[in-house]
Structure formats: C-alpha cells, structure tokens
Amino acid sequence: FDQVYNRYANDDEIKKGDSLAAALDKLHIFQIFEGNPSATKSLFEILNGVVVIDLSGYDSDIQSLIVAITLDLFYSQMQASGSSKMEGNYRQLTKLILVDEADNFMSEGFPTLKKILKEGREFGVGTILSTQFLKHFGSGDDDYSKYILTWVVHNVSDLKNSDVDFVFKTEAKSQENQVLFNAIKGLTKHHSIVKIGNNKPVYVQDKAFWELYQEAH
C-alpha cells in the first residue's frame, strides 16, 4: 500500500483534496494494510481455514473502506479462480463468507456484495448474512432477499406478521402465517426454523458451539 500511496501523493498531475485523497490518507495514517510488498499475499491465499477480519474499534467510514476494498479483491480473485467442480447435482464449496451484524454492511449498498451473492455459487462461494432483524434484508431500494435461497430463523424479538410473509411466502393473516409467527416467537436457544427454496419450513435443533468443542476434545 505504501508504494501506491507514495506514487499517488507524489504525482502532481493527480487532483488532490477529493474523497479518494481522504480515503487514501486515512488508510495511510492508520496503517491498515501492509506496506512491504514482500510480506503480502493474495487474499485467496490468506483465506485458508477460518480467517476473522475484526473491524471493531475503527470509525464507520474506515470500516466501510476496508470492507469495500476487501469485497472488490475477493470478487476479482473469485472470478480469476474459475468455476468450482461439479459432482452430480452438487457443487464444490471453496469459500464461505460469514458477515456478522450484516445490517451495517447491507445498508451501505456495496455493489460487490450483491455480485458475490448473485454469482458466487458458480465459483463455489457461499455467503451467510447474520443480523438481528428480518426487516434488514429488504429495506429501501436494496432488497437482499432476492439473492437468498436459504433462511435460518431464530427467535426474533420484534417479529411482525409481515416478516413471516416476507421470508416464508405465506398469505397475509392466514393460519399458516400465524402458526409460523407463534413458532418463531416461541423458539428457545439453539433452535431454529429453516426455509430452503420452495420447500416447507423445517424445525431444527442447532448444534451449539460448546457441543462442537466437546466433540473435538
């Protein structure tokens, strides 16, 4: 990044003082990215196993910058990697992105996030958007629900009947809607209702993190 920044800063023909300059200055001041090219790897090389990008502690504008750059890099390298392998009706899963508190990013309307959601399957890339409320998926002009085929719904504190219609495609004020509404409100910890495509909802007992830990040890 230092090479890019220095070339940009020392080029008098490039107009300064705009939003791009402000973004580069912040990334440079906070030393977000590695400055030494020999110490860097491609994003896909780093994504081996579980990799957590912790953005807590940064201002929201810096978080948005990092997310936008990371998503753009991921998308370009995803396409360069080519289509994933097929085995019968099943496609190889190569990468899985989990976005926690996804409403913070969905509200930004990142174009690349939508591209990954829309095109990722061909490249074996799955995406999980985790958020507290169902309304976050369809607010404003950004309707993320059209890119989602699988829903895993836990207990929702401010659930509305319209949310049930939105996810489960039930008719408003129908008996099915009310049954699902009551079921979701009554879900206990580590229990969920799963909706896959056009299939009927399935009640699931989730495997808790401590159960996975016990199995591993």
Predicted regions mapped to residue ranges:
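Short, solvent-exposed amphipathic alpha-helical segments in soluble enzyme
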Residues: A68-L71, F168-T170, W210
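Short alpha-helix boundary/capping motifs
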Residues: L98, I148-L149, A208-F209
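Active/binding-pocket-proximal capping segment
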Residues: E87-N89, K95, L134, Y144-Y147, ...
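Charge-patterned, long linear interaction tracts outside catalytic cores
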Residues: P201-H217
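Conserved ATP-driven motor cores of ASCE-family P-loop NTPases powering translocation/secretion/packaging/pilus
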Residues: K114-Y203
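A broad, structure-centric signal for solvent-exposed, well-ordered loop/edge residues
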Residues: I62, K160, E211-Y213
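P-loop NTPase motor domains
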Residues: F1-E122, G138, K185-G197
